[in-house]
Amino acid sequence: MDFELEPSLEELIKQDTLKWIFVGGKGGVGKTTTSSSIAVQLALQHPNDEFLLISTDPAHNLSDAFCQKFGKDARKVEGLSNLSCMEIDPEAAMSDLQQQAQQYNNDPNDPLKSIMNDMTGSIPGIDEALSFMEVLKHIKNQKVNELDDSKDKISYRTIIFDTAPTGHTLRFLQLPSTLQKLLGKFQQLSGKLGPMMSMLGGGGQGQQDMFAKLNEVQKNVEEVNEQFTNPDLTTFVCVCISEFLSLYETERMIQELMSYQMDVNSIVVNQLLFADDDENPCKRCVARWKMQKKYLDQMAELYEDYHLVKMPLLGSEIRGVENLKKFSKFLIKPYDPKVDRGIITDLKEQ
């Protein structure tokens, strides 16, 4: 390449068309801190717009990151009025799904009902499917809210996802195309089963409602599929640390994302020591920094057309809005150990 991309997420933060930002990577590399930092910077840079941060990771950490309890409903972040957070609870969502199924069919002996209960309890990736249904719900709400001028309705400019570790995330992102095919087959099946059920005395209003709902879901899924593959609307931020396994996982994930035609052009590398710029570095720090630099050099060569953001290792956990505000600045303005070391050592313990 004739030019080098900025080692920051400034371009992403300023982009005014993005609706969906996914943040993902291997477990334990700082996904929640990174997704929270991106959300905080978006809220700070665009104070007149609303943003939503959703955790789809079953091991929810948003409440810990912001020192504030979040649940399945969007709740405003204290100290940042235009940012809301929510944590999707698969078990609660499963319970809601089964209750909704009860509305369509109250016969406990119906074999179709038994099959549906077995399916929802045993499908691999059901957590991801339920998380995805929450996404569909938000798309529907967005459409309604954009047409509604009342002040109590919130239309989010961008929704940021703090995702589960890589395997779960890739299954989650496969769902739009998988569901699209599955719902298409359901539609074909409903066309054949409908007349048969009527002849057998079944197929009342409840089943008509169910097929109508499937139609609506299919349209929403098709729309999500289009949005997820549009680089103006959706992007994925990879998070890793400068070690072999993390680099390997990141490359695997990027290849998968490209196969889904999803935009990915940013990588955040966390927990860097920058021992060269320390006046009195310990021997262990120097040895580890030497290893980190080796993999950083490989990343720089492998991902020369990506925004490669280098974030420092901190002396304490990043918790609370004020600490996130300080740390998230390095996503916009690259960390300089000679100038910024004082900032990361002065973070307040929460």
Name what the model sees in each region:
Residues 1-21, 26-29, 34-222:
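Nucleotide-state-sensitive switch-loop elements of NTP-binding domains
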Residues 1-14, 225-350:
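C-terminal lobe/tail of nucleotide-utilizing enzymes
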